[in-house]
Amino acid sequence: MDKNRRRTDDAGLMTKTLAGIAALVFFLSFICSSYDITVTHVISTIDVILEESEYYRSAKEWTASSIDATWNEVSIPSRKAEHIQAINPEVDVAAGGKHVFTPEQLHFFDGTRDSKPIYLAILGRVYNVDGKKEYYGPGKSYHHFAGRDATRAFTTGDFQESGLIATTHGLSHDELLSIRDWVSFYDKEYPLVGVVADLYYDSEGQPTPELTDVLARVEKANEYRKAQAVEIEVFPPCNSEYNQNGGRVWCSTKSGGVERQWAGVPRKLIEPTTEKFRCACVKNFGPGVSGAEEVKSSSNRGDLDHPDLELFPDCSPTSNSCKIVS
């Protein structure tokens, strides 16, 4: 039997198995609704029992990999850190009719006055969004941004008055990069009409030390994202599933969204500064890919000797799957 025929037969068998499971779930739903039993509890219990079956685990992994493959085909890839240009803090207010607004003046452009267009500011940069009144007009989804600099709310989603503020103090790397992405979006989609003299620009339209500090933090966050991207390629995240009794982590050649030639084995990847960990799939044969000094001495253990890795409790060092006990 050739490989293509065998793959087709396996897929058909998996499909029949999953159809049977679906029928069982339907039957259980009927019973549970009739006798007031919690469906979630019953399904979780059955899942724990069936986990002992290698065939059941294979069926679940096949389903997960099929979903991953479909998602990869239809999803739009996110832009990598290096694909977005750094924010230029200089805004030539003397050119092109740009203005320096006070916060009070900017408030007049909140969309409540028919005689004035709708403006908003982010990192002190003022954009004309009047062409999208269906988004920024009174009563619309994004009206809370109109007539003010609410930089922080672009990433926190806090639309209370106390959250509609310009400061970025205390924001995480990802939140700072989200603001950078929003600025890139507005630069591309809307006219830049000036700056607001407040936290990020002075009365002459020149960048303040606060803006310089924020942009330095954004660049640091960008470098952090690049380093994370490299780490993900070396130590891809594990597949995982959880229930009331714990869960399971396992590795495949596509786990973590990183397609590769090896599956690896699950390990705890420890962050040295915080001592937090995540599950990582680690190459367990041939030369390592991490470049760590500890793995260079071996030519056939992959990255297993990396100093930031630990075994999961009660899991075989060679196992492709590890149980997690809650």
Curated annotation (Swiss-Prot):
Alphabetized InterPro entries for the sequence: Cyt_B5-like_heme/steroid-bd, Cyt_B5-like_heme/steroid_sf, MAPR/NEUFC/NENF-like
Gene Ontology CC terms: endomembrane system; extracellular region; membrane
Gene coding for it: tag-131
Name under which the protein is recorded: Neuferricin homolog
Cellular compartments annotated: Secreted
Residues spanning the signal sequence: 1-34
Primary localization: secreted
Keywords: Secreted, Signal
Similarity annotation: Belongs to the cytochrome b5 family. MAPR subfamily.
Domain topic, free-text comment: The cytochrome b5 heme-binding domain was proven to bind heme, although it lacks the conserved iron-binding His residues at position 136 and 169.
Highest taxon of source: Eukaryota
Family matches, as PANTHER family: MEMBRANE-ASSOCIATED PROGESTERONE RECEPTOR COMPONENT-RELATED, NEUFERRICIN
Domain Cytochrome b5 heme-binding: 98-197
Protein's job: Heme-binding protein.
